[in-house]
Every structure is written in C-alpha cells, then in structure tokens.
From Swiss-Prot:
It comes from Drosophila melanogaster. Its EC number is 6.2.1.3. The lineage of its organism: Eukaryota, Metazoa, Ecdysozoa, Arthropoda, Hexapoda. Keywords: ATP-binding, Fatty acid metabolism, Ligase, Lipid metabolism, Nucleotide-binding. This is Very long-chain-fatty-acid--CoA ligase bubblegum. It is an enzyme of class 6 (ligase).
Amino acid sequence: MSTIDALYNRPGPNRLRQADAYRTTNRQDAVKIRMAKDGIGAEEPISVPGLLKRTVNNYGDYPALRTKNGKNGYHTVTYKQYEQKVHQVAKAFIKLGLEEHHSVGVLAFNCAEWFYSAMGAIHARGIIAGIYTTNSADAVQHVLESSHAQIVVVDDAKQMDKIHAIRDKLPKLKAAIQIQEPYSPYLKKEDGYYRWSEIESMNVSDVEDQYMTRLENVAINECCCLVYTSGTVGMPKGVMLSHDNITFDVRGIVKAMDRVVVGAESIVSYLPLSHVAAQTVDIYTCAFVAGCIWFADKDALKGTLVKSLQDARPTRFMGVPRVYEKFQERMVAVASSSGSLKKMLASWAKGITLKHYMVSQGKSSGGFRYKIAKSLIMSKVKQALGFDRVLTLASAAAPMSPETKKYFLSLDLKIVDAFGMSETAGCHTICLPDSVGLNTIGKTLPGCESKFINKDANGHGELCIRGRHVFMGYIDNKEKTEESLDDDCWLHSGDLGFVDDKGYVSLTGRSKEIIITAGGENIPPVHIENTIKKELDAISNAFLVGEQRKYLTVLITLKTEVDKDSGEPLDELSHESSVWVKSLGVEHKTVSDILAAGPCPKVWKSIEDAIKRANKQSISNAQKVQKFTILPHDFSIPTGELGPTLKVKRNVVSKMYADEIEKLYA
C-alpha cells in the first residue's frame, strides 16, 4: 500500500476522503488530489490542523503571536498557547451551533482573534470566510449568505452595526461575536450576540467528544477556506480552497524563499487577512516555519506601519506596490529636506548600490565602494525603516513599476515580485533570490505548472496554471467554475504574458482589462499608465480610457496629503507635488488652486509634456494618449476608487467619472 493509499484508512485530520473529481462547487464534497510522480508535488499532503500540531510538537514554546500591549509593550502567545486558544474557540463555535461544512465569517482588522477564529473554524471542520472591513452591509450579507455562515466574528461596534442591519435576512446565522470594546448595545438586549471574552471563558466540556469526532473527520481534500474575489464584474465569487491547496502552496513558498530558518522568522501582519496572499503567508506559512507574527494597528496603511516594522524588525515583508510607493515618497521627502552634504552622500551611496545590483544582477560583487555605502549609509536607512533584518521583500496583488524597484535597489533593498490568485491559494510564481527581476514575476513555484495558450505572433498568450494549489471550484457556481477550470485541471487565469527561455514569467495585462478601441486595437492599460507616471513623479494615478472610442484619454490624479484618521485624500499637495509646482514658478498649494486657475497653464503643460514623452515610447499610434484631465482628488479606499489591497477598481472609476470622461470625447 502506498503512502497516499494509507491516508484513506486513517483518522483525521491528516486523512483523505474518497473523491470522484478534481473540481466541485459543493462545499461538502472532497476532490481528488493531482499528485506528481516526484519532487514537492509528490510529497505527502497535510491538513491545516496537522500543520499547526506539527509545529506545536516541535516548537511549542516559541513565540507565535505578538499583540501591542500599551504604548511600547507587546503581549506574546506561544505556539502551545495558540493551539490551546484554537481548541477553546473551536469548541465554543460548536456549542454556538456551528455545523460541519458551514462557515465562520470574520469581519475584522488583523488581530490574534482573527487567527483563532480561522483555525478554530477549520479545526471544528467548518470553513473560514474572511470579509473586508470596508465592505458595505449588502456586501457583507452576500458573503455570509453565499458561504452558509452560522457564526460571524466582528471587530467593533461599527462592524456589528452592519450585522445588526442585515440579521433578519440571514436565517442561518446563529451567533455574532464582537472582539473589541466599546460593545454594541445589542450584546445585552438581544439573543445571539456575544463578547469575545465570553467565547474564551465558555464552559465547553459538554462538546469535548463532539469536537474530537469532528477533528478525526477532517480531510485534507475538503474545503476549509473561502476567499472572495474582488467582484469588479458582478458579485464576488467564493473560491473554495482545500487543506491541500493551502498547505501545498505554503510548501512551495517556503522552498522558493531565501535562507529560511525555522523558529526564527518574523512577519508584520497588516494587509487584510480576507485577501488570499495575506492569509496564506500570515496564518499558514508563518505557522509552517514556526515564525512569529507581529500585529500592526488599524492605522498601518495610514502612516503607522513603519513604527510596527521598527518594533518587529521582520525577516520577511510583503506589500502591495502602493505601500512601497508610499515608503518611497516618504524617503524622497526626508532626503529633500536634508543638508547639502547629506544629500550628496546619500546620492553617491544610492548610485553605487544601484550600479552594483544592475551589473551583478543581485550577486555580491564585493566591490569596495559598495561595501562602504552599504555599511555606512544603507544600514542606517534599513534600520530607520525596520528592515535591517529583512531577507525577503515581496510585492504582490498588482504589478510594480521597474522605477520603484530600482529606487529600493539603490537603498540595498531588493523587492521580488510574487504572483498568484485567490484561485491558487495565494502564490504561483516568485522571483528567486539571485534575480533582480525588474520586469518579471519570477519562476513558477516548485511542483506547479504554467503554460500560455492562444499565443500571438510575439509568443504572448493567456497564462494557464496547474498544480495541487489550484482551487476546488467556486461555491455553488458551476458555470463560472467550468469557465475557469477546464477538464484537464488547467486554471485559465485571464492574465496575458509570456515566459522566456530561462523560465521567467512576465505579464503584460489582463484580458478583462484590455481596452479595445473603436478601430479594433487591443491596448494594455497598465503599461501605458505606468509609463506616464514614470515621466512625472507628482502623478499619483493615471487611468487610461478608450474602450470602443476613437482615441485614448487619461484621467490624472496628483499626489496629495492624506487624512490620518479617515485615510481620505486631502486637497493639500504632497511634498513631492509642491516641489514640482514650485519648480514651474507657481505657488499653488492645493489641487483646487490648480483647477481654479484655469487649470493652471504651467501645470497643464508640464503634465502634457510628460504624456508626450510617454507617447514617444508607444509601439503604435493607437497606443498614444490624445487628451487628459485632472481629477479633483486622488484615488483612495474611502472614496471608492481603490480596493482593500489598493488596486484600482476600473469599473468603479469609469462610472464615478463618467461625466469627465465624456467631456474628453465631446
């Protein structure tokens, strides 16, 4: 009997259920696992509870979670304590009515309770379903309803208000639990509302046997996690991920990372855990390597992230491109306010460091000047950012411009692109440690497959993906599942690109984002937008328009200050924009000032010239921008143009600024 065959005859959680197909839309079904003949794809599968148990057995006294406790201190939970919390929460969920294959929704910022809820739901043979805190009540209802949620855990009274508003529309929902004070009035007045402290102190001895039976029935090839797509077209789809989808992807990520030291890794958790990349890295990968999670506070993306990084000094960091751009803007502002000698030294050091990477492609050249720059200047820069111990800086969720990568290379900080989807449990390709990778998303993870179909004359086509990390199907949505996942288990990503002779994958756009002009030309918007932004640092967003139009136009937003409380863009120009405006010989301090001046002719011409420079880099006349306009404020999450991971919602922007767009074609 093979090792895999033996998994069908053992108790859970590390067991397999018999299955007839590789895909399903039923949350109660199991799926077949596509085992490879050798390599990582042939390794024995493991469940999420099995992964945690193995780490607890070997590293039980190591720190697992650190939460801010007061102004400067942190409360630490070890892996043994973490597991004990998970068991308590799992039993409490069962006592509150959680049935097998039903979900627990979590509507909260990153915190230890998020982790306990996710692991607790999975250990109880339920399903974890994350919900973005920025979701409206209607969007929350969609997730809870479609995921068959029986319990929801929320962050605070604001989120509980959303639940209360839709509670009557959710007959399956049995309990709503609030983590933080001040507590909503419903917790005292109405049944079915609980404080988190009640979950931790609940007497669960009467469900002990039931819990152990549940845990023994957990199977590696059944659904344990639902991740919801962005919903840019229609309602978000629920991506069903099995234990093996997640734990196999985790193995691939760890194998691809540089110098992993089990028991010594640390990560700052700040990207929304509802996003597949954050959940896979923070909850599951960190547990796999017995790493320590440091929780950033709610305002991390509003300016407090650096403080958390300084406290944690992480060994790995994952960000979206906009986070790195914010770091860059801050560093540029600080540098411009320095004295002339400091500026000169910093400029020299950055030039030497960038040259080292561009010449050596990231391999240590041992150059004397590089060593001096690294030890005297770059070490201080890294320390100021909290990156003095970091081994991997990864960028995910959207393409990063080569210019931003070069800026960080000049600081001796190498950012590697990682690519994945909700449907691939988070990661499919990653740049290897020995590659600078300015224009690539890296190589396919070990044990996974990539191919490009429907190629054009240049060898560019649609990326298709196969491997044990590819999802089970969309919950209760057979049509969309069969559209995305073919009979040979290839996932059709919708991403366009190519692979070079060394195996490095590059993406050029998404098929759904491609603009088709009235003349039938296919235009990749992101490349053109990034080219325009590269030509003028004061531009925050360039949004290309031209679907079924005779020519291309672009909506421009300028970099401005941000309200630290709400996260909304202010009218006041950022330092970078102010320096640019002054260089033009005008004294405008706000976007309103610029627009009220006509718009300001000098500002207008500067943007126009930047677009002309970008147009010179176009491969055809059809890809040249003919007109533009300046929008009254920058894009943001609160104003609706950006999603939770700071990606532009293209359909939303097109609707919000429909009048401005029509004027460009009048």
